[in-house]
Structures are given as structure tokens and as C-alpha cells.
Regions:
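Beta-strand elements of repeat-based all-beta scaffolds
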Residues: 1-65, 69-145, 150-183
């Protein structure tokens, strides 16, 4: 692959390094193949291996972390937003669900997508599945953790994040916007 190496120094002392090796995944698309890191002057160690990327845009589909843990990603909303992160599963495990979830994310019924994402979580009991939905052109709408607890994101009429609620409807965070008058 083609490496990109970043080294960090403080007062002339090497704190660490990161090497990202790029690969041509087809059609001239260069995307990461490996990420290696080190602390101080120790040798670089492989931390992430990219097993599969989307050849149309370079989004990671399956990566393997140090220790062998596989993490898969399903991209929706015309492959622009992450809709599912699946830890402890391979692409072969998630592939049967991918096209349907992507199609549902392009529809207008968010609840149908949420139900399908929850079905993915149920279908992969040994995986940790985190799912996401979005309000197009606004921002994230829901995040559901591996236990199935959903946080919802609420926006004001200007598309600004107003508050975040937990699964019980409790407000976790709130944003207030104040304007200064101009003189």
C-alpha cells in the first residue's frame, strides 16, 4: 500500500507515530488498508485492518481491530450516513440485511427503518449493534445502543439541536440559543 506517516513530537521527543497504508480498492479508489500506531519510539503495531470498503465512495464496510474483533458498518441515506455499527460480526453476517436497510433509509418512514434496525439487532444476538437514524439536511435523529435503549434528538424550527432525550423521555442535554442585538 501507499503509506501516510504522521509523527508527533514535543520538545524534540517523539511521543508517537501513526501510519495509514492506502490501497487501490478498484476503479482508482484509494482508501485505507491498515492503520498502525506506536507510542514513543516503539515499533509500529497494526491496530486496524480494513477488510472491505465500499468501492463507490471508500466508506469502511468491515474492519478488524487489534485482537481480531470484526466491526461492520452499514451506510444509508444514499450511503452518506452510518446507520448501523455492528461489533463482533463479519460482512457475511450482515450482508443479507444491508440492501434492505439501505433502501428503507432512503424512504420517508423513519419508524419502519427503526423497526428494521431493531430486527438486525435481534438477528445477531452475539453482536453489539448500535444504530442511527437521521433527519435529512438537519442531523441525527436517533441513536440506539446495543441494549436497545434509544436516545432521540430534537431540533428547533431553525434546524438547531434543542435537546436530547433518553429512552424514558428524560432530557439528557438541552441547548438554548441567545442572540445579541447589533448596534
Amino acid at each position: 500500500g501507499i503509506p501516510l506517516i504522521t509523527e508527533t513530537y514535543k520538545n524534540g521527543i517523539k511521543l508517537g507515530a501513526q501510519e495509514t497504508s492506502f490501497k487501490d480498492w478498484g476503479g482508482g479508489l484509494l482508501a485505507p488498508e491498515f492503520i498502525k500506531t506506536s507510542k514513543g519510539t516503539t515499533p509500529l503495531e497494526t491496530r486496524v485492518i480494513y477488510n472491505k470498503v465500499d468501492p463507490s465512495n471508500g466508506n469502511p464496510i468491515e474492519v478488524q481491530k487489534e485482537g481480531g474483533i470484526h466491526i461492520c458498518y452499514i451506510w444509508g441515506y444514499n450511503k452518506t450516513q452510518l446507520i448501523a455499527k455492528i461489533e463482533n460480526a463479519t460482512y457475511n453476517d450482515i450482508q443479507p440485511f444491508e440492501a434492505n436497510l439501505q433502501a428503507l433509509s432512503n424512504g420517508t418512514n423513519e419508524q419502519v427503518l427503526i423497526t428494521a434496525l431493531n430486527n438486525l439487532r435481534t438477528a445477531l444476538p452475539n453482536a453489539m449493534v448500535t444504530t442511527y437514524t437521521y433527519k435529512p439536511l438537519i442531523g441525527i435523529s436517533t441513536v440506539t445502543d446495543p441494549k436497545g435503549d434509544m436516545q432521540t434528538y430534537h431540533y428547533d424550527g431553525f434546524g438547531r439541536l434543542q435537546f436530547v432525550k433518553d429512552a424514558q423521555g428524560n432530557i439528557l442535554s438541552e441547548n438554548q440559543y441567545h442572540y445579541r442585538t447589533q448596534n
